[in-house]
């Protein structure tokens, strides 16, 4: 789904931070200032936003995985909801250091989470003593909170999408170390350095956050449906040929 300039305005994407907190590296994306608040140039945001969405669309069309990241209070729910809609992994609680660079260890925690979930599903937890069951239940809650959003992520993601790159410096650094492309919302108080696909704009307003997250989720779904259409188109021809052949054999 395409996003219009009007929608960006209505969501307050153009409202940056107070001018005294600005990062000079964001100067190319700043239109001016109003009441000591920097105003983002939406014409430039629009171009960058579309570039980012094209990248996400292509990635999804190639069956790639994009990890959604934002642990900010006002972004958590929105981000998790849109990531789930797109069938993508997400981190909405706390970024655990080494989540990417030490994925081997994270994988062990994911394995444990699935084991505990299976215990609850098949009822084997009921065979434990009350005290043991309570310990396991608490462990499950802790694991679900920290890695529940990435439990189906089999390996490292092909890209990460971050709302507020300054707030998630560790995630950005880990992605850079591993050469994982970063799609990031960058406000006027942060540096766009090291962000492969910059979306210059407000990273605090929940309406703006929803616009970005929905856009990325839509791009993922569009990329995926494109693949399905291609498979159906290619498979459709094959299916017709096979069917004709089998009818001839029957006759």
UniProtKB/Swiss-Prot annotation:
Keywords: Ribonucleoprotein, Ribosomal protein. GO terms for biological process: translation. GO terms for molecular function: structural constituent of ribosome. It comes from the Bacteria. It holds the Pfam family Ribosomal_S2. GO terms for cellular component: cytosolic small ribosomal subunit. HAMAP family: Ribosomal_uS2_B. Belongs to the universal ribosomal protein uS2 family. This is Small ribosomal subunit protein uS2.
